Regions:
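Hydrophobic anchor at the beta1->P-loop junction of P-loop NTPases
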Residues: 20
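Short beta-strand-centered segment that lines the nucleotide-binding/catalytic pocket of NTP-utilizing
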Residues: 38-51
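Walker A (P-loop) ATP-phosphate-binding motif of ABC ATPase nucleotide-binding domains
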Residues: 17
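Conserved glycine(s) of the Walker
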Residues: 27
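Hydrophobic positions on the alpha1 helix immediately C-terminal to the Walker A/P-loop
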Residues: 31
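The conserved Walker
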Residues: 24
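Pre-Walker A adenine-sensing motif
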Residues: 2-12
Length: 144
């Protein structure tokens, strides 16, 4: 019953930003696509047609691109539906700050969602196990 009430409350909100966090393969992208009318993630920067071409030297640029896309969407009022979802690993709190700042600037309510891999999701980007473990070890949660 509480989930239904929360859904109704969120749907009635004018401007919402969903920040979807989790390790690679957890299902962030799938969830984010279902939440917002617009969805962004840094991985989109590496898409060439239908092919994903990751380049570690461009990681900073990919995150700048993602933040810029979110801001453009917020500025434009997201053309009729102001629900935006951004999904990245966001393993540390400071990585979300630029998005929280944008939300404050443009009057968006922020919901942060942590996606766990309880469904046995596959790591589609072939991130090595040791990298996943390092990401898990630095994953920060700040509960009030």
């Amino acid at each position: 019953m509480e989930n239904i009430q929360l859904k109704k409350q969120i749907k009635s909100m004018d401007k919402v930003l969903f920040i979807v966090r989790g390790l690679p393969g957890s299902g962030k992208s799938t969830l984010a696509k279902s939440l917002g009318s617009v969805h962004f993630e840094a991985d989109m920067y590496f898409m060439e047609g239908n092919e994903y071409k990751f380049d570690i030297t461009k990681i900073k640029k990919s995150h700048e691109w993602c933040q810029n896309q979110v801001e453009i969407s917020m500025k434009n009022g997201n053309i009729g539906d102001s629900r935006i979802a951004v999904s990245n690993t966001f393993t540390q709190e400071w990585e979300m700050k630029p998005y929280v700042d944008l939300a404050e600037k443009y009057g968006y309510t922020v919901f942060t969602i942590i996606v766990e891999n309880r469904h046995g999701g596959v790591n589609v980007h072939n991130v090595p196990e040791e990298t996943l473990n390092a990401m898990l070890n630095r994953f920060e949660t700040k509960l009030i």
